[in-house]
Amino acid sequence: MKQKVTKEKITNHQKAAKTRRQRGYQWEDTIVKRFKKTENWKAFRLGSPSIALPDVLAVNTEKSTIFTIEAKSGTSTSLPVPADQIERCLEWIKTFDIYKNKQVLLAFKFLSKKRIDVGVYENRELREFFKIWDEKLEISDCVCTYNGKIYSKINGV
């Protein structure tokens, strides 16, 4: 009996992980499509989570601008961004000397359903926020709330 419960738990965790990956991919894809619809912008998804790359790279050669974008999507009331993901975005834009304007964007999408419990949701307004990372700040974990406020997490708080 224990093995069966364990297998069910593993299956549920695998399903949840797959759903999170799909949400992330869809949000990244939406961002890429929005940039591509805008004149003189090109954008690309850069890879999977196993590779240390930003989620999206967007460039405008006419305006000499490049953005590395870390995209977060979810059903909770806050979406965290680990410091190492911000750091890799900063490292990437620093390698492109040809661009005069280089910025890291954090893109947050709070889905129209809020997770209350495992498999339990309530409806809410879909919200999106785009934040420019201030390079003068010390790199740290940060979190964006459903209200669009962004906070630095220090020692996990």
Name what the model sees in each region.
Residues 1-47:
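Acidic-basic catalytic patches of nuclease active cores, encompassing PD-(D/E)XK
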Residues 3, 18, 22, 98, ...:
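Domain-level recognition of nuclease-like catalytic cores that cleave nucleotide substrates
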Residues 45, 70, 106-108:
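Structural signal for conserved beta-strand scaffold positions within catalytic alpha/beta enzyme cores
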Residues 49, 60-62:
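A generic beta-sheet turn/junction motif
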Residues 74-106:
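Short, charged, amphipathic alpha-helix that recurs within catalytic cores of restriction-modification
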Residues 50-53, 114:
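Short acidic/glycine-enriched loop/turn segments that link adjacent beta-strands
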Residues 35, 56-58, 65-75:
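Conserved catalytic cores of phosphodiester-cleaving nucleases, focusing on short active-site segments
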Residues 12, 53-55:
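Alpha-helical scaffolding within the catalytic cores
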